[in-house]
Amino acid sequence: MIPPEIRRSVLLQKAIKLALAGTLLTFASFSATAADPSSDTETPQPPDILLGPLFNDVQNAKLFPDQKTFADAIPNSDPLMILADYRMQRNQSGFDLRHFVDVNFTLPKAGEKYVPPAGQSLREHIDGLWPVLTRSTKNVEKWDSLLPLPESYVVPGGRFREIYYWDSYFTMLGLAESGHWDKVADMVANFGYEIDAWGYIPNGNRTYYLSRSQPPFFAFMVELLVQHEGDDALKEYLPQLQKEYAYWMEGVETLQPGQQNQRVVKLEDGSVLNRYWDDRDTPRPESWVEDIATAKSNPSRPATEIYRDLRSAAASGWDFSSRWMDNPQQLSTIRTTTIVPVDLNALLYQLEKTLARASAAAGDRAKASQYDALANARQKAIEMHLWNNKEGWYADYDLQNNKIRDQLTAAALFPLYVNAAAKDRAAKVAAAAQAHLLQPGGLATTSVKSGQQWDAPNGWAPLQWVAAEGLQNYGQDDVAMEVTWRFLTNVQHTYDREKKLVEKYDVSSTGTGGGGGEYPLQDGFGWSNGVTLKMLDLICPQEKPCDSVPSTRPASLSATPTKTPSAATQ
């Protein structure tokens, strides 16, 4: 390594020019969107752009078992200087790439394994985890990929060392249930800050997540805060709700029937719906090698198209699932951007309803009426285009083939969750979910076994909550109880054996963590903790709360959802 004290200015300038030239040359093969790292002083650059060929070489060398490790590494000095050093040294005899990385970067520390005190109940274990999972960005380094936030926040756990958008809502449910309303308020404030900073909420607070968002749960977060602070929370966050809506609807005013623009689509009949989209079409920095391998496995498709669809699936939160693929056994057939997801549009319906309510709270009746009209139009579009009449369930719309898709997934419960479903259709969805998705350990994500983590036999805490509350909204209490009871039993049995909660569960039985996907099973785990606490308080009466799952199934759920039903349910 060249000592810093002998880096004379002329030599450094020459090296930097060479480094930048190498960066641009390397990334021309991935996407025309790659840019000079110094060209944008406003938006922080992700590590694949900041470090160019060095990042590519480190990831391709597979120096670390998890590709996210180097994506999260912090440069110890100006990345341009590190890149200049690298280009000057890499072809020298005896050059050691791992040593170079160790000298020039601070790698993320492996989190200390949390060992709970002996004899803790499930509730006690979760309550003890909140401080363990709480993080702050007060000391973020200059070139860190971590994006600073003004308040502390709760992370999922494991390899996920940052805040994630849709995860956080389900974590916040548990924080509220534990009485940590201060943490709930802090996390809502953080997301409001991100909307003000970027115009939207990124996938997570990392530079490499800035090109996409995630399922839009901010409206639900604000509605949760209303339970503690009243309508003042609606008025406080109305500007941020409006900005997030503008992000999702950007470009709608110029669309003609049959056209799409980023996240918004206009169908042939003029109906406006949304899809997931990532602004970049390169490999994901946190899964670099895997994405390149996926693209290479299907040379008949442009690599950039595959990269965009992989990234857009990450934006959906369902990364990955047969839901997005033509061939469930071949990830390279993914085409997320040609699919209109039923869950996304249900969530945007909720955002429109919350905007109407917030506008009314702020005294703007005209705006409230406008948002109500937008919500009603979306609800009609959901009923018209996202209902599979032949199968009897809500499903995604296929833009490529101009028809409704047949696959039943747990996303079919989202219209029930936001009270956007007609009563007769809600009953059909409940019957379908009970017949095809309900398993001994909870609700399966799909009925397809693809080896991907958002497929059978995995069940995920947020989807259990959405299903249980959605079913309750429409009086399907028995099915809601079965989902709740079976999933809680699964969580309890796993905790009894392993003394931890995990990211996902195998619902084909009880007591087993889930598998599949790009990385090992993670424990912690934010949204599992939050949903478990909420469900514990659903199955046990308020006057006699339970700290662990009872050994026998209760006769009924003790609480009901607090959301006001929309006109669709009347």
UniProtKB/Swiss-Prot annotation:
Residues 554-570 have a biased composition (Low complexity). The active site is at 319 (proton donor/acceptor), 503 (proton donor/acceptor). Its EC number is 3.2.1.28. It is found in: Periplasm. The keyword Signal applies. Residues 544-570 are annotated as: Disordered. Monomer. Provides the cells with the ability to utilize trehalose at high osmolarity by splitting it into glucose molecules that can subsequently be taken up by the phosphotransferase-mediated uptake system. PANTHER family: TREHALASE. This is Putative periplasmic trehalase. It comes from Salmonella typhi.
